[in-house]
UniProtKB/Swiss-Prot annotation:
Cellular compartments annotated: Plastid, Chloroplast inner membrane
Taxonomy, superkingdom: Eukaryota
Protein role: Involved in protein precursor import into chloroplasts. May be part of an intermediate translocation complex acting as a protein-conducting channel at the inner envelope.
Keyword annotations from UniProtKB, A to Z: Chloroplast, Membrane, Plastid, Plastid inner membrane, Protein transport, Transmembrane, Transmembrane helix, Transport
Record note on quaternary structure: Part of the Tic complex.
Name by which UniProt lists this protein: Protein TIC 214
Gene Ontology biological-process annotations: protein transport
GO CC terms in record: chloroplast inner membrane
InterPro entries: TIC214
Protein family according to the UniProt entry: Belongs to the TIC214 family.
Primary location group: plastid
Pfam families registered for this protein in UniProt: Ycf1
This protein's record includes keyword Transmembrane helix: yes
């Protein structure tokens, strides 16, 4: 038997090994692919994470099961086509799933309480089923609507060439299960770490997790909307010959229409003859083909594929051409590389020569250049014999023709190019032009009485007039100056002379061009301050921080003279009012107004309009009420492309803040110094905070905050686009509530009551339903009449108010009519879009009473009664039986006791009477006769009483026999037992409640005390274990205590410690002596060491204490300095602990073993343990510093600090640094990086050889009407607010030209360029050669040298320049080999090249993509023989059967 069993095992193992070895790579690869499918996190994974961290284990397990079943369904869709049609194809179910995701988000928002986030432990709970359904639905979502990476990973698995193999499929399934279970275990570990490591209670942390998951879910819900972001009724236009109704098509086909244009459509002009055609005029759109068509083989048949990849077709043509031309042979192989090299070098030389000849023609033949330039790139338009305007020829790739567009010169370039010279000074002027990109020149030129910037040249006439005005002012001032002030007179006369000289030079054309900076340089440096004083304007005002603009407008013509700081900063009011740019008032209702259709700035929205009639005039005045909300959303101008419209996402409709993309083009941030009144606003806030106490008026503040939030929401959603949707939904919600929702609820409620054999409540429900009525209000909440609708409610918005809102009750409680009449109040609320109710519009939500809570209460009561009733009946029956038996025994015992008591009484009487017998013998005989007579009387009376009792008993028995029919013994007993049981039940209930409560309280107290006691014991045992290990080291420490001084002095302070340490030579060690040396140096500088203690003064004490880091005063001194309350409490504490061990007049009692520290409390067990801990710490600190021999002595003389100090020493602690920027607004902080870049750039300009200097810029003030700002940096990039409206300045084409100037313009001579071209033509391409003659008329910002050559030549020249032809030829080219061994040598050489060169250049991410990521592996090339996924059509997911390699046609 043993041999047969062993042979069986051997055969089984060999067969198993054979089975494993064959499909081993497939199994491993399947496990790898299965594990990769679990790596990406989808929507359902987020649901599982949320349920595990918040709702507990059961709900997370259910969600996890839903995730796995969803993945199985996705696999089924790949392998089984009916499931593919059911799930993946766009149907109504998938659209409903998107709506379900929004409902899921809304459900998460409502779960904000602890009760909602409580863990559901039972499997029957509804939340567990919801969690399963959520994860299952989100896993099955269509990848068209919501991109799921798991589905694409599964597609890669299916497209593997061995996907039909069973071993691969099983191993893939096992790998996916392993990955999912690892994911679930990781979630359990994260939950455990949260519970253990968090400083917050876990229920509080649940709320934080739930709040952080809600925005993630909302973003995921918005992904399908972002994919189909175009809005049909806004962007789509009606096609020719198409019906205006969209009901002709099926509804899903409208959304998923393949013919619907999602890309820019070709644009052509109707009038092609006009050369100066503007792209925004007379445009029309036509739909054309968007895909690449190609023949392909599908299932053996040639078919046209519209999803055929264009890259594959190009590759096919290249392969066919290369195989036709290329032919290998042994003779041609040797000269292959050399021929190719010679050919490319000759081609490179030809291109370089061509470029050089064209550059030479630029300098020599000007007319040829313009002709050539006009034919190739565009045309020039002449204006006064100067080429100022240029029309560029733009090649549209989508059109097979060229169109000419006029390119305007950038408004960012304020100065003309002809003024720039090739000298060094011109180069710095060009650098300054970079600052001009932040200033709108168009605004400054159009504004009245505005001044040109510093870098522009001044006009001669304006300059002469300005100088004459200055001369008059100077002459007037010379009259007022006294004769004694010779210096000022000389300065004034010198200024007048310089002005006269400049006027004469300008008049005789000696000075042709001059700037304002050059004009200031003419004056002497000493005269500038006096010049500023003399050139002040007639109307002056100084700029203050707390400037009131309302008063400024009222007192426009008055004079103000105030000072801000040391210097006067002047401001002219009239010039400010002149420079204000008036905004245009749009007349929306006037038909003759023509708007600018080119710009994308929207007009201000009008809320309402009204007409005002004037008494004595026929005409009316139209009054417009504009909306408060701003709309900076870019408008779609006429003829805009589809690509421009497609980028208008739905969530970008509400960019009303400064963070909108509109301001990215013209955003200019201000520093904190630029923002007016910021400092004072902060002070006002702090001032008002002091009036509000933290304890009072809390409810008042909360109400104010809620009201502010409500007003903010009202202001935020006051938009026409929102009002259209919201008002329609509100009206639909009201109709749905009144006529659908509530009647259905009433019907089902009464039907269920009838099924449960309860009376129906139709009349009450319908009467309450009729009492609910609706009032339509304006958007602000102002009410209207009952049946009145507001005007233009779609555009202006609407609110719906509910009066006596109806909510369903399970039953009605009967109350008296009077109480209802007294307590009756009209309830009001406002309806929301989601169907809920609010107290005020956008206010607090009202929670309606739930329908199921009273039902649950009643059901729980009935269940409890049913459970406890049989137990109570058994208890009653047992008590009754016990009472019966007990009563019988008790009656018998009572009778016996009564009989015994009677007999005992009689015997006692007899005994007493016998004891009363007279002992005298004489009297006995005389009294016997009396006793006999007395006994006879007793017997007679007893007989009489007995007869009476018998008669009474007989009468009683007769009465009982007569009334047997009325009362029975059983009934009497039953009544007695019932009363007894009721009393017992009450007592038992009270006893149970009290007993359980007391037991719980006692157990809680015991558990708390035990835990405290256990923690104390554990802590002390650990300390004992540590201290026992250090006992030996502590004993060794005692041997070193002889060197230490005795510090048991009662009046101990820092100075005494330093003195004793110096005496005993302890501070020899470097580490100990580090801080001491610093103090000693400072003490030597103060010269206090040699002074006697008697001669020391208070100032000496201060100097000494300032040089020492810290000072710890003595106990006596501290006792005097401390406050009374603290002192008394400390003294009482010391007296209670150890009264005998401490006295202020005597020294402290200290044990012999401890000579270092004094203690003032009793010696307990805990105190002893603390002492040991302290000793160990002291030993560990001093162990490194025990080499204390041969130390220096008397480094510091004795100082006694026992005398009291009257002067306090203060230190700067906890003083807030106000220079630190706090509470910075998010709008400014977000753009900080741009502001810092600009600052660095401007600093670099102002450093070297620049004309703009601080003094010079400051001295320019009298020539220009502007604010006087001392910091030139702020003024240089100060941006006018109204220039935001100059939108044309910030277009993309003009910004591109500005960037080209910064990169490409370098004024180099043509000879240098020719030399560079001969050496390396790449450097020549980066610069444009311009001589002094051509620079005057040539528009250099339009082209580069690359434009002179064709596009193909440019690419070819760049590639040829990048190649290095000087390298030696590879080894595999030099060797003559046979065709058979050619592949071997090539493979070896390629391996060596790859190992040396390419692997070093590969990044880590590329290695991960090649070897770990599934979509980048080589096996995915085999996917093409099964399916080809379309990459061109990005809006849809399409598959098509293709071959792996296309047929190459000869």
């Amino acid at each position: 038997m043993i041999t047969t069993y062993s042979t069986f095992l051997f055969n089984f193992l060999s067969q198993f090994q054979y089975l494993v070895n064959i499909p081993e790579p497939l199994i491993l690869f399947g496990l790898y692919y299965g594990f990769l499918t679990t790596l990406p996190i989808s929507f359902s994974h987020i649901v599982v994470i949320r349920n595990r961290l918040i709702e507990g284990k059961t709900s997370s397990v259910m969600a996890f099961c839903g995730l796995i079943t969803g993945q199985l369904c996705m696999i089924g869709t790949i392998y089984y086509t009916p499931l593919y049609k059911l799930f993946i194809k766009p149907h109504l179910i998938l659209l409903l799933s998107i709506i379900y995701s929004f409902f899921y988000w809304q459900r998460l928002r409502n779960n904000q309480n602890y009760d909602d986030l409580r863990e559901a432990q039972s499997l029957i709970n509804v939340r567990n089923f919801f969690s399963f359904f959520d994860s299952f639905v989100f896993q099955i979502l269509n990848p068209i609507l919501l991109p799921t990476p798991i589905f694409f990973r599964l597609n890669n698995v299916f497209l593997f060439r061995y996907s039909n193999n069973l071993n691969f499929f099983l191993s893939f399934f096992i790998g996916s299960l392993i990955g999912n279970f690892l994911f679930f275990n990781a979630l359990n570990w994260i939950r455990y770490r949260f519970e253990q490591d968090s400083n917050v209670i876990y229920p509080v942390l649940k709320l934080l997790i739930n709040k952080s998951i809600i925005p993630i879910v909302f973003c995921i819900c918005l992904i399908p909307i972002a994919k189909y972001s175009h809005i049909p009724f806004c962007t789509m236009k009606q096609k020719e010959g198409q019906s205006s109704y969209s009901f002709d098509k099926n509804w899903p086909n409208i959304i998923f229409d393949s013919n619907q244009p999602h890309r820019p459509i070709r644009i052509f002009s109707e009038t092609k003859t006009d050369d100066n055609l503007n792209i925004n005029d007379n445009l029309s759109k036509k739909q054309t083909s968007q895909f690449f068509f190609k023949e392909c083989i599908s299932d053996g048949n040639v078919r046209i594929s519209y999803t055929y990849p264009s890259t594959l077709a190009n590759f096919q043509t290249d392969l066919s051409s290369s195989f036709q031309d290329f032919s290998l042979s042994e003779q041609s192989f040797d000269n292959l590389y050399s021929n190719w090299k010679l050919e490319k070098l000759s081609r490179k030389d030809n291109l370089n020569n061509l470029l050089l000849t064209k550059i030479k023609l630029l300098n020599n033949k000007k007319e040829w250049f313009y002709k050539h330039f006009q034919n190739k790139f565009g045309t020039f338009i002449k204006d006064d014999n100067n080429y100022n305007k240029f029309v560029k020829k733009s090649n549209d790739v989508r059109l097979k023709q060229s169109s000419k567009i006029q390119i305007k010169k950038s408004k960012l370039l304020t100065s003309d190019i002809r003024d720039i010279s090739t000298t060094q000074s011109g180069f710095y002027d060009l650098k300054k032009n970079k600052l001009k990109s932040f200033i709108s020149q168009k605004f400054k030129m159009n504004s009245n009485n505005s001044t040109l910037p510093v870098w522009n040249h001044l006009n001669k006439q304006l300059l002469q007039n300005e100088l004459k005005r200055i001369k008059k002012q100077l002459q007037d001032k010379t009259k007022n100056i006294k004769e004694n002030d010779f210096n000022n007179l000389k300065l004034l006369k010198s200024n007048i002379e310089t002005i006269d000289n400049t006027i004469n030079d300008i008049h005789h054309n000696k000075i042709k061009q001059i700037t304002s900076v050059d004009l200031i340089k003419i004056f002497a440096t000493n005269n500038k301050t006096l010049l500023l004083e003399t050139l002040a304007f007639n109307k002056k005002i100084t700029q203050k921080d707390n400037f009131n603009f309302n008063k400024l407008f009222q007192h426009k013509n008055k004079k103000f003279t105030t000072n801000s700081g040391n210097e006067n900063t002047y401001l002219n009011l009239n010039d400010i009012f002149k420079n204000i740019k008036r905004l245009p008032k749009w007349r929306t209702f006037s038909k003759h107004v023509v708007y600018d259709e080119v710009s994308d700035i929207r007009r201000r929205a009008i809320k309402s309009n009204s007409k005002l009639k004037i008494a004595n005039k026929d005409s009316d005045i139209i009054i417009f009420e504009y909306k408060k909300s701003l709309n900076f959303r870019a408008r779609l101008p006429k003829g805009s492309l589809r690509a421009r419209r497609k980028n208008k996402f739905t969530w970008k409709l509400f960019h009303n803040n400064l963070n909108s993309p509109f301001f990215i083009r013209s955003k200019q941030l201000l520093n904190k110094t630029d923002i007016p009144f910021l400092k004072y606003n902060e002070n006002y806030l702090n001032f008002f905070k002091n009036f509000i106490s933290p304890d009072k008026n809390i409810n008042y503040l909360n109400n104010d905050i809620s009201e502010m939030r409500r007003q903010e929401l009202l202001f935020k959603w006051d938009k026409t686009n929102v009002h259209i949707l919201r008002s329609m939904v509100l009206v639909g919600q009201a109709f749905f509530r009144k006529y659908i929702k509530l009647p259905i609820f009433i019907f089902f409620k009464n039907l269920s009551r009838q099924l449960l054999y309860q009376p129906s409540e139709w009349t009450k429900d319908w009467s309450n339903w009729m009492n609910e009525w609706y009032i339509f209000c304006y958007y602000d909440g102002t009410e209207l009449a009952k049946d009145q609708w507001p005007e233009m409610w779609l555009q202006r918005g609407i609110q719906i108010k509910l009066i006596n809102p109806f909510y369903i009750k399970p039953w009605y409680i009967q109350k008296s009519f009077i109480k209802n009449k007294q307590n009756k109040k009209t309830r009001t609320s406002y309806l929301t879009v989601f169907g809920s109710q609010q107290e005020l519009p956008f206010g607090k939500k009202i929670r309606m009473p739930s329908f199921w809570k009273p039902v649950r209460r009643e059901v729980s009561k009935s269940i409890k009664l049913k459970l406890y009733f049989p137990f109570l009946t058994l208890q009653k029956n047992t008590i009754i039986l016990f009472e019966k038996v007990f009563n019988k025994k008790r009656i018998n015992e009572d009778n016996k006791t009564i009989e015994k008591s009677i007999l005992n009484k009689k015997n006692e009487q007899l005994i007493l009477k016998k004891d009363e017998v007279i002992p005298n013998n004489k009297s006995i005989a005389g009294k016997l006769s009396k006793l006999d007579f007395h006994n006879q009387n007793i017997t007679k009376t007893s007989i009489k009483n007995a007869t009476k009792q018998i008669l009474i008993k007989n009468e009683y028995n007769s009465l009982l026999k007569e009334n047997k029919n009325l009362f029975t013994k059983n009934k009497i007993v039953f009544l007695k037992i019932k009363n007894i049981l009721n009393k017992l039940n009450l007592k038992l209930i009270k006893v149970k409640i009290n007993f359980t409560y007391k037991i719980k309280t006692v157990l809680k107290i015991i558990s708390r005390n035990l835990l405290k006691f256990y923690s104390i014991i554990q802590f002390q045992l650990e300390n004992l274990g540590r201290n026992n290990s250090n006992d030996l080291s502590y004993k060794n420490q005692l041997s070193y205590q002889k060197d230490f001084p005795n510090f048991n002095n009662f009046c101990l302070n820092q100075a005494n410690i330093i003195q004793n340490l110096c005496k005993n030579n302890i501070l020899k060690h470097k580490k100990l002596n580090q801080n001491f040396q610093i103090n000693s140096k400072n003490l030597n500088q103060t010269n206090i060491i040699d002074v006697n203690p008697e001669n020391i003064k208070a100032q000496d004490f201060k100097n000494l204490l300032e040089n020492i880091y810290t000072f710890t005063p003595t106990i006596n001194l501290w006792d005097k300095l401390s406050t009374n309350n603290w002192k008394i409490s400390v003294q009482n504490n010391w007296k209670q602990k150890s009264y005998n061990n401490y006295d202020l007049t005597k020294k402290a009692l200290v044990s012999k073993n401890l000579n270092f520290i004094s203690y003032f409390y009793q010696n307990n067990l805990i105190n002893n343990l603390n002492k040991k801990i302290k000793h160990t710490k002291i030993f560990n600190l001093s162990k490194n510093y025990l080499s204390l021999n041969n130390l220096n002595q008397n480094q510091i003389k004795n100082f006694d600090f026992q005398n009291s100090l009257n002067n306090n020493i203060t230190y700067k602690k906890n003083i807030k640094n106000f220079t630190i920027r706090q509470n910075v607004p998010s709008q400014l902080r977000r753009w900080d990086w741009k502001n810092n870049k600009i600052k660095k750039f401007v600093n670099r300009l102002l450093q070297k050889n620049t004309i703009l200097l601080k003094e010079e810029v400051f001295n320019l003030i009298p020539f220009f009407d502007r604010f006087t700002i001392q910091n030139p940096m702020i003024r240089n990039w100060s941006h006018p607010i109204s220039s935001i409206l100059d939108d044309e300045i910030f277009t993309y084409e003009l910004l591109d030209t500005f960037l080209q100037i910064n990169k490409n313009i370098d004024f180099l001579h043509t000879k240098q360029i020719e030399d560079n071209l001969s050496s390396n033509s790449n450097q020549a391409i980066a610069s444009l050669p311009l001589s002094s003659t051509t620079a005057e008329n040539f528009l250099y910002y339009l082209t580069t040298v690359e434009d002179l050559i064709s596009i193909e030549d440019k690419k070819e020249l760049k590639i040829l320049n990048s190649l290095n032809f000087n390298k030696s030829t590879p080894n595999y080219i030099k060797t003559n080999v046979v065709e058979k061994s050619l592949n071997e040598n090539l493979s070896k050489n390629l391996q060596s090249i790859l190992s040396k060169e390419t692997l070093d250049s590969i990044n880590n991410t590329q290695i991960l993509k090649k070897f770990l990521w599934a979509s980048y592996r080589c096996e995915d090339l085999a996917c093409m023989n099964r399916f080809w996924f379309s990459t061109n059509n990005g809006s849809r997911f399409g598959t098509l059967r293709l071959r792996l390699y296309p047929n190459l046609k000869n």
